């Protein structure tokens, strides 16, 4: 008796299992669906990752202890009133900061999303920034790298981003992904891993022309940096980026006023 028919059945069953486990090319969050079609279906895993990190970021911002910073500790501060709070997690030190940006929430979200590739023009810490793909208007994959900052040499990131309108504001979330077709043009830079990054933009109830902004980040900088060194500088880097970002929006507002 030949075993060929039985072998074929096993192969067919295995094939069916693989096909059934294929990543769904669609993602629905807050009543908005990102649909990947054609060649963009190769980014389905990245889209799934975005769904996961968005849920984590939203949970952090919605936690009843977030605004009071219960469970966080004060990490860094400056003379402009900026304060970084931190908490240690199994993946490393998570940091968060809140600030007020001098533009309406819709404009802040639009600039943050669409202005990504212009970051090196005004942020001295960013060496390069580019979109790898933008399969939908709410989901993209980007690469960017920073210059040497403090004791940390330049790092490269490849991450997927997603945003949604939530209530009268917005939430943006990002996490590192692997894109097999992407080849870095920046040899020598260590590829860091972004476990989680998120921003929440809300209109200021006392002044709708400004935006209340919360940012959270957890990253593994990789390389040979001791954990102690990373913990010492990550909050300071967040302070620097916050000050730079706020000044950027102040400059944008000034240009609009002058025009």
Curated annotation (Swiss-Prot):
Which regions span the lipid bilayer?
none
Q: Which GO terms describe its cellular component?
A: endoplasmic reticulum-endosome membrane contact site; late endosome membrane
Which segment of the chain is annotated as a signal peptide? Answer: 1-20
Task: Could you list this entry's UniProt keywords, alphabetically sorted.
Answer: Signal
The UniProt GO MF terms for this protein read: lipid binding
Q: Which GO terms describe its biological process?
A: vesicle tethering to endoplasmic reticulum
InterPro entries per UniProt: StAR-like, STARD3, START-like_dom_sf, START_lipid-bd_dom
Tell me the domain of life: Eukaryota
Where do the START domain residues begin and end? Answer: 43-254
Show the PANTHER family listed in the entry. STEROIDOGENIC ACUTE REGULATORY PROTEIN-LIKE, STEROIDOGENIC ACUTE REGULATORY-LIKE PROTEIN 1
Name of protein:
Steroidogenic acute regulatory-like protein 1
The record lists the organism as Caenorhabditis elegans
Q: Which gene encodes it?
A: strl-1
């Amino acid at each position: 008796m030949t075993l060929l028919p039985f072998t074929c059945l096993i192969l067919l069953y295995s094939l069916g299992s693989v096909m059934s486990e294929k990543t769904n090319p669609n993602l629905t969050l807050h009543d908005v669906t990102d649909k990947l079609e054609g060649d963009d279906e190769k980014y389905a895993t990245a889209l799934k990752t975005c769904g996961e990190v968005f849920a984590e970021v939203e949970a952090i911002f919605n936690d009843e202890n977030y605004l009071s910073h219960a469970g966080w500790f004060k990490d860094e501060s400056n003379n402009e009133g900026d304060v970084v709070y931190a908490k240690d997690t199994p993946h490393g030190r998570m940091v968060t900061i809140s600030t007020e940006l001098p533009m309406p929430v819709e404009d802040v979200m639009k600039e943050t999303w669409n202005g990504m590739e212009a970051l090196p023009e005004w942020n001295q810490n960013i060496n390069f920034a580019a979109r790898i793909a933008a399969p939908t208007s709410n989901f993209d994959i980007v690469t960017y790298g920073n210059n040497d900052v403090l004791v940390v040499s330049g790092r490269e990131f490849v991450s997927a981003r997603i945003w949604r309108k939530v209530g009268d504001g917005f939430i943006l979330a990002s996490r590192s992904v692997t894109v097999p077709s992407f080849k870095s043009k920046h040899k020598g830079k260590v590829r860091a891993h972004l476990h989680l990054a998120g921003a929440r933009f809300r209109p200021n109830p006392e002044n709708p022309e400004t935006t209340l902004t919360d940012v959270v980040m957890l990253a593994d900088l990789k390389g040979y940096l001791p954990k102690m060194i990373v913990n010492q500088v990550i909050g300071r880097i967040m302070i620097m980026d916050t000050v730079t970002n706020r000044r950027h929006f102040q400059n944008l507002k000034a240009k609009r006023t002058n025009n």
